[in-house]
């Protein structure tokens, strides 16, 4: 997990030098960002992947959540004619990246939850879940310590 944090830091440095909006919140992505460079597109894909792994890590460790969310799907990010906007696509595949001729880039992340038997022996507070919705830039303290 420390490696993910280092990668995220490097990605943030690259994105700071671009015209991309600085503070990207994954549940409220800006609707239109014109003329994204290829570097920024890759950086954004890496950030989404880091966020996906972070969410999987949190959800897989919390028994009360893993019993309720057997499967959940992440939205995909679509870059279409240099316009950047989020679109939510439902799928049952574990991890999909699909491309269509009309779209420059489509990134679709979805994951099917697998309950860990050893997670039943742990107990976590509700703040761990609420911290998840604040985004990757503000992770819970237990995530940083591992």
Curated annotation (Swiss-Prot):
Keywords: Cytoplasm, Membrane, Nucleus, Transmembrane, Transmembrane helix
Broad class of the protein's primary localization: cytoplasm
Protein name: UPF0742 protein PB2B2.17c
Coiled coil: none
Similarity field: Belongs to the UPF0742 family.
Topological category with respect to the lipid bilayer: Single-pass membrane protein
GO cellular component: cytoplasm; endomembrane system; nuclear membrane
Residue stretches spanning the membrane: 38-60
Record Pfam families: Pombe_5TM
Subcellular location: Cytoplasm; Nucleus membrane
Lineage: superkingdom: Eukaryota
């Amino acid at each position: 997990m420390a490696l993910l944090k280092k990668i995220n830091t490097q990605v943030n440095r690259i994105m700071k030098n671009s015209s991309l909006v600085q503070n990207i919140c994954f549940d409220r992505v800006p609707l239109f960002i014109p003329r994204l460079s290829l570097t920024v597109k890759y950086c954004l894909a890496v950030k989404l992947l880091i966020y996906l792994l972070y969410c999987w890590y949190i959800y897989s460790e919390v028994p009360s959540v893993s019993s309720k969310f057997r499967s959940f799907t992440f939205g995909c990010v679509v870059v279409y004619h240099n316009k950047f906007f989020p679109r939510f696509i439902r799928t049952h595949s574990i991890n999909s990246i699909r491309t269509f001729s009309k779209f420059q880039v489509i990134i679709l992340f979805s994951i099917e939850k697998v309950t860990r038997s050893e997670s039943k022996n742990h107990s976590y507070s509700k703040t761990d879940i609420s911290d998840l919705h604040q985004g990757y830039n503000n992770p819970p303290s237990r995530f940083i310590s591992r």
